[in-house]
Amino acid sequence: MDQWLEEIRAALPELVVYQQEPMKKHTTFRVGGPADLYVCPKKQELPVILGLAKKKGLAVTVIGNGSNLLVGDKGIRGLVIEVGAQMNAVEVQGNILRAQAGALLSQVAAKAAAAGLGGMEFAAGIPGSMGGAVTMNAGAYGGEMKDVIRQVTVLTPECEQKVLSREELDLSYRHSCIPKNHFLVLEAELSLTPAPEQEIRAKMAELREKRVEKQPLEYPSAGSTFKRPEGYFAGKLIMDAGLRGYAVGDAQVSEKHCGFVINRGNATAAEILQLMKDVQERVKKQSGVTLE
């Protein structure tokens, strides 16, 4: 690890490398132990960082905005790469919007609205970045990334850039081919639909109101904790199992929306995992449905 640090500092003297960085600072759950090494690189620095990590046998974990993510109390060994503020450029040409992987979905939706392009309204309130949204085919309120993606540029494990079409991405409910191939999203190209800016902003405001009304946005969480089982709603299954407000330490099933597990202040990853396990067991016993 020391040798990697030495070599990376020689190769990229401007790159800031944090050591023993608390991951709770970088997740929306506000939970997680320290990362051995932590960087937030520019796009052109990624191949150098990954190449050196591979050469030294250093484990690599890539994160985006830290939503939909639970980091253990002991943290993450090796190197954590945040695809974030150094990779968040967004540009519009005609009805095509290009966004780097670190661009926040709220930022992308706002840029699309300002250009009079509809299609990203559903994503305006999702607390994630473009890279994560593509990787898991993020969606809300009847929309998903699959509806708007034209193509995506990724970095392969061999540090080569590759362009994937929407078909090649194999997008389905909260799924893409990216994780199994160990690709790293660099940029997404979206095909959007011209619409009056006022209408787009009105739709975004309407969805924002729904979120504020129905979701526990006042507490740290990772968003919806469980996938929606086919034919059911996870939140209703949890509520029907009598688990509204159920808590383990400072981890709690939200009273506002049972599909969310929240951190009431000082929850640990162990408490959250135990809570999730308890919920899965109770729901399975009550309804026969397995929550993922």
Task: Name each model-derived stretch.
Residues 32-33, 38-44, 70-88, 135-166, ...:
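Structural signature of FAD isoalloxazine-binding scaffolds in flavoprotein oxidoreductases
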Residues 105, 109, 123, 127, ...:
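Hydrophobic, well-ordered secondary-structure segments
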Residues 36, 68-70, 76-82, 106, ...:
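Short, electropositive, low-hydrophobicity segments enriched in small/polar residues
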Residues 2-130:
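Anion-binding (especially nucleotide phosphate/pyrophosphate-binding) glycine-rich loop
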Residues 18-19, 155-274, 281-282, 286-292:
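Phosphate/pyrophosphate- and phosphate-bearing ligand-binding catalytic cores of soluble enzymes
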Residues 68-69, 109-112, 120-124, 137-144, ...:
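A generic local secondary-structure boundary/capping motif
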